[in-house]
Amino acid sequence: MQGSVTEFLKPRLVDIEQVNPTRAKVTLEPLERGFGHTLGNALRRILLSSMPGCAVTEVEIDGVLHEYSSKEGVQEDILEILLNLKGLAVTIEGKDEAMLTLSKSGTGPVTAADITHDGDVTIMNPDHVICHLTGNNDISMRIRVERGRGYVPASARAQTEDDDRPIGRLLVDASFSPVARIAYNVEAARVEQRTDLDKLVIDMTTNGTIDPEEAIRRSATILAEQLDAFVELRDVTEPEQKEEKPEFDPILLRPVDDLELTVRSANCLKAEAIHYIGDLVQRTEVELLKTPNLGKKSLTEIKDVLASRGLSLGMRLENWPPASLVDDL
């Protein structure tokens, strides 16, 4: 049955084709004409600029004072080594930064598999080449990896640090986004007699630290949260009325189920009487890790989901919970 001419079509089919563990194609149809490019471009920009991830931010190499130099017995110069280190695909669980070490001697390639780290760190591309040793030499370095979002150039971080930064500590341009490549294509779609519709095909490749399907879901959630502000706009022709400012951000009043956490994480929170997002953000990492069956992986998931909404753990909320929530409990 055909609906009103003023109604918009809503996508009825979402097909996910997993090309390989790091690449997926997502097809969404049907869309009104023009909406393919509107949604495709918005999701593409969010995936490239707003997804949280981990990246190398600092490096110290024994015997090296600055990046515009070379090291005896190493085929690559220091700038090339730093560029190769930026290609490390790393995840950190339960904390925001980690220090890795690399020491190797001999002749041949030095890869990510030669890096020493603790159990909270996982390197997804151990075959990634960092440099090549020649003439039976050695190399030692310390690598700092941090969690973040977007792109942070080394020059921006250098301006915020003290002037007495140790010589030899090399800052690295940090690209935290786990999305390596994203492209979209808009094709023709048809519903009954209508042939002027759009089909959106998103082709995405990640660095292996996040599932492509999960990345698209998170980017769509970020977009929806940002558009909520426009949904709440009032007609400017209405007379001004003094309204009491909400005591809390509306997102804090939502149930934790709206975060779409895994079943394990959601059940752990409910067992601790954490029913609303406002309840959750007031907990600290230490408090959550004391929750039975909630481990570091679940904690990382919770932090990432909160970060995508501009929230974090350890927030202080005065007069929480509001009376409306107390009445509902």
Swiss-Prot record:
It comes from the Bacteria. The keyword Nucleotidyltransferase applies. Residues 248-329 are annotated as: Alpha C-terminal domain (alpha-CTD). It holds the Pfam family RNA_pol_A_bac. One of its GO terms (molecular function) is DNA binding. The keyword tRNA processing does not apply. It is an enzyme of class 2 (transferase). Coiled coil: none annotated. One of its GO terms (biological process) is DNA-templated transcription. Keywords: DNA-directed RNA polymerase, Nucleotidyltransferase, Transcription, Transferase. GO terms for cellular component: cytoplasm; DNA-directed RNA polymerase complex. Its EC number is 2.7.7.6. It catalyses: RNA(n) + a ribonucleoside 5'-triphosphate = RNA(n+1) + diphosphate. Residues 1-234 are annotated as: Alpha N-terminal domain (alpha-NTD). InterPro entries: DNA-dir_RNA_pol_insert, DNA-dir_RNA_pol_RpoA/D/Rpb3, DNA-dir_RpoA, RBP11-like, RNAP_asu_C, RNApol_insert_sf. SMART domains: RPOLD (SM00662). NCBIfam families: PRK05182.1-2, PRK05182.2-5, rpoA. The N-terminal domain is essential for RNAP assembly and basal transcription, whereas the C-terminal domain is involved in interaction with transcriptional regulators and with upstream promoter elements. DNA-dependent RNA polymerase catalyzes the transcription of DNA into RNA using the four ribonucleoside triphosphates as substrates. Belongs to the RNA polymerase alpha chain family. Homodimer. The RNAP catalytic core consists of 2 alpha, 1 beta, 1 beta' and 1 omega subunit. When a sigma factor is associated with the core the holoenzyme is formed, which can initiate transcription. This is DNA-directed RNA polymerase subunit alpha. It comes from Shewanella denitrificans (strain OS217 / ATCC BAA-1090 / DSM 15013). The lineage of its organism: Bacteria, Pseudomonadati, Pseudomonadota, Gammaproteobacteria, Alteromonadales.
